[in-house]
Regions:
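C-terminal accessory helical subdomains adjacent to catalytic cores in phosphodiester-
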Residues: 5-147
Length: 147
């Protein structure tokens, strides 16, 4: 699952974990993992991690608009859903992976239960209104399959 974590959705964790547990039961191969790929507020935060390490508050519509403006400042043709501009940004994905990993590590001092992809960690991420992205974990996983 990929979704933006927003303050309005904090109470939806119990619904989400029910769906996740249902999908886990439906797996034919128990080694297949059901992953949550989350980014705080909006996808533009993940895109900005391709350019810099930062973790601003992204709780309001104004915050999301600011994030969109930051992406447009570094990629002027960017619009949501535009393949060409997103592909240009994606070329810098190794930087985004490093920056996203650092944002997660920095959250340990705020109470993040650990870096491992567990239900406890994901519940914490979904309910604390901190800025982060776990998209890097899927990319690292896929890169590991190539080896």
């Amino acid at each position: 699952f990929f979704f933006d974590v927003e303050t309005k959705d904090i109470r939806k964790w119990d619904q989400r974990i029910k769906v996740i547990n249902y999908l886990r039961k439906m797996r034919k191969n128990p080694k297949i993992r059901v992953r949550l790929l989350m980014t705080t507020g909006c996808i533009e935060y993940w895109l900005m991690l391709h350019f810099k390490m930062f973790a601003p508050s992204i709780l309001t519509e104004t915050d999301k608009k600011r994030m969109l403006a930051e992406v447009v400042a570094v990629e002027p043709t960017y619009e949501k859903g535009d393949y060409a501009s997103t592909a240009r940004i994606a070329e810098r994905y190794p930087t985004a992976i490093k920056n996203a990993e650092k944002t997660l590590r920095n959250l340990i001092s705020d109470g993040l239960p650990g870096l491992e992809d567990t239900d406890d960690r994901n519940r914490w991420l979904c309910t604390t209104c901190k800025t982060f992205s776990t998209v890097n974990e899927a990319i690292s996983f896929l890169e590991g399959l190539e080896r």
